[in-house]
Amino acid sequence: VGGVVASAPGKLILFGEHFVVKGYRAIATSISLRARVRVEDTSGSWVELHSPTLGVRSRIPLDLSRSAGGELDVYVEILRALRKEGFSIVPHRVVVESEMPVAAGLGSSAATSVAYTLAYTTLLGSPLYGENLLRVSFEGERVAHGRPSGIDTTIAALGGTILYRRGEKPAPVSARIPEGYVFLVADTGLKRSTRDVVDYVLRVAEMMGEAGEQVYAVADKVVEKAVKALESGDMELLGNLMYFNHGLLVAVGASNLALDTIVDIARMRGALGAKLTGAGWGGCAVILARRGDVEVLRGELERHARMVKVINVNVPGATVEKHFV
């Protein structure tokens, strides 16, 4: 049986979430938590889908005439997009696993879409990479998930760190994280509707009138400074900008007690920076720390978060890990 295993990274928004909705800039980076997809040849007349992470399985006919239901629909949409590009649809089994918690704002869904697209096209002998991989995976995400921003898919396909503004092509940021510094991601375990938080924050900003506008303008200045800090490897400045950005997100109503507690603990335990990442009201916080402080910090955070992981950022994008025949 021929088969391929491909993986793609998750993402963190380091700066600018929420403000990006009104056309301001954000910085996103790839993380060392990855989604892995194994695609195997089968005999039969089905595409079989299995996600141990989500605990779901389904099978769909090769003519793609019906959906897979729920979370698995994105794979059908990717196959439809590939068929339009001239790829054939052959019987195969798909097994999806992710190191990221689902719906925590870490881009798990886009990473699995990208890894699947790469694995399947590699199985057929014409692997898609770079912009082509991005285009097809994004099409699947778009049909399955409404209006994704494209940040998650871009990071999953290309890796690295990007400066992003809605409606523009993302610009790469050459981030330099010196030895001896690490990031941690802490998941509150609280699920929330991104749409609800986004609508609430927009309402708050509107209510504040000119003051609201100024918060957005300040957030954009923070992004500008953060690009310089990343490129020069100035971790002390980067950390302070993270705390500052969190404060702005608190001001517009995106945080909650669980996130603020994590950020406060990080500050008390000497972390260089911490903030919520993504939509807020739950999901994850990101923390920047010196390597020597990690154990104490992690121990303390684990009492308040469902999951705490030490991660690398600015990692490579989608890649084929195994190809067996």
Model-derived features: positions:
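C-terminal nucleotide
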Residues: 2-15, 20, 28, 36-88, ...
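A short catalytic or substrate-binding loop motif that flags glycine-/basic-rich loops and adjacent residues
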Residues: 29-32, 279
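Glycine/charged-rich beta-loop-alpha catalytic/anionic-binding loops adjacent to active sites
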Residues: 62-63, 90-102
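Glycine/serine-rich anion-binding loops at beta->alpha junctions
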Residues: 7, 97-120, 271-286
